[in-house]
């Protein structure tokens, strides 16, 4: 079922009556307004200009063909992502996915039934065949934030969203607070391709909420490429900008513990 299909539009209409649409950045009620005027200045200030590609001297990209993020992980952008992850706000994740489609891929966003809808761009011509969200724990929140962000992106790029392609291979510690080398070791071997037929020979667009060091995206890319993907490019709503990092020279060792 397409994300913007008629049944889902009807369900959204009911939701709008019970839970009015809110700004993903400040949580103010928006209704049918396209963007929040109160957040416009800060949102623009947090955009990464002029380019959104990540620098390999600042992030570990591993086997990725590249990575991009339109925002710095600060201020209202950081609060929006944390709200989507920890405050039971899946529609915040969807709204951020719409913004990602617009800023990263040039999709024009129009209002339809009081909802922002990204218009189609040719995803295959941009070099992608499918979209794969980074697996994340959904047991407590009931949904996967990168998957929700990827839904409007898949619609805008007219690409299949392969939610069953990639999954956890083992439990791991949380990445937050770990130094760079420990982040790499923590996610090494943490992901596996659950159905190789979904990605074999395909150019994968990997979607995450935040790219910090790049360790998680690189670990996902390693799993996808090992299973036959032709290439993997990562995109996220935001990234943390670091000074140049020293790239690892030793093989990564698996280190299992907690949960994804």
Q: Which functions belong to the PLM regions below?
A:
Residues 1-207, 212-260:
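Glycine-rich phosphate/pyrophosphate-handling loop used in enzymes and phosphotransfer proteins
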């Amino acid at each position: 079922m397409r994300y913007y299909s008629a049944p889902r539009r009807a369900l959204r209409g009911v939701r709008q009556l019970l839970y009015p649409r809110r700004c993903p950045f400040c949580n103010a009620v928006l209704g049918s307004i396209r963007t929040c005027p109160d957040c416009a200045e800060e949102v623009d200030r947090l955009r990464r200009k002029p380019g959104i590609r990540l620098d390999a001297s600042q992030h570990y990209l591993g086997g990725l063909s590249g990575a991009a993020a339109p925002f710095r992980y600060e201020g209202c952008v950081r609060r929006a992502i944390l709200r989507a992850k920890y405050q039971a706000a899946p529609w915040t994740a969807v709204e951020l996915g719409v913004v990602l489609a617009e800023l990263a891929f040039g999709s024009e966003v129009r209002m339809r039934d009081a909802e922002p809808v990204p218009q189609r761009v040719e995803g295959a011509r941009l070099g992608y065949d499918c979209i794969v969200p980074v697996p994340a724990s959904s047991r407590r929140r009931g949904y996967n934030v990168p998957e929700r962000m990827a839904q409007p992106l898949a619609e805008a790029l007219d690409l299949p969203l392969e939610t069953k392609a990639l999954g956890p291979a083992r439990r791991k510690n949380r990445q937050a607070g770990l130094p760079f080398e420990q982040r790499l070791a923590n996610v090494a071997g943490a992901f596996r391709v659950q159905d190789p037929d979904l990605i074999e020979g395909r150019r994968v667009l990997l979607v995450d909420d935040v790219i910090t060091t790049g360790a998680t995206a690189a670990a996902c890319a390693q799993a996808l490429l090992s299973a036959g993907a032709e290439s993997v490019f990562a995109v996220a709503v935001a990234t943390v900008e670091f000074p140049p990092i020293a790239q690892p020279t030793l093989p990564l060792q698996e280190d299992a513990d907690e949960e994804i």
